[in-house]
Amino acid sequence: EVRMGVDVDKKYVDEFKPDAIVVCCGSKPIHLKVPGADGENVKVATDVLMDAAGVGENVAVIGSGMVGAECAIDLAMQGKHVKMIEMQSAIGNEIMAQMRRPLVEKMKALGVEMLPGTRTTEITGEGIKVVNAEGAEEFIPVDTVVTAVGLRSQSALY
C-alpha cells in the first residue's frame, strides 16, 4: 500500500507500523551564477517544459543533460530556433549512453545548434556572452535563455 500526501508523526508511525517510510521532498533548480541570470528573459527549463508561454523565437538552452535535451527538443518541435550551450566537451555527457545518441540525433534532425565546450559568462536582455570551444569570447543573440544546469534536492525537512 502506498500513501502519498500524508503528514507523518510518531502517532502515525505507531498506529500504522509501516515497513518503510519514503520521504520525497522534491528538488529545486540550480541557478546559473553569472551576471544577468536573474533577468526577465531567463527561464528555468522545468518551468518551460510545463508551459512554454513567454519563450521567444530564438532560444538558448544552457545545459545538455536530460532536462536540457528534452527542453531543446520540445522548443524545436514548436518551431523555435534553439542553440544548446554546454560547457563540457560533449553534448549529453550526463545522459545514459543508450539514451544520449537518440536524443542528440533528434536534436540534430530538428535543427538544434549544439555548442559543446562553450561557457556562458553573462546574460543580457539581447542574448548571452560566452567563451567558445576555441577560447574566444562571443555574443549569441537570443530572445530567451533557458537554464537547465541541474537540480538540487530539497532538504528542508532533514
Task: Say what each PLM segment does.
Residues 1-2, 103-112:
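Helical element adjacent to the flavin cofactor pocket in flavoenzyme catalytic cores
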Residues 2-20, 24-34, 38-41, 46-98, ...:
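Rossmann-like dinucleotide/flavin-binding elements
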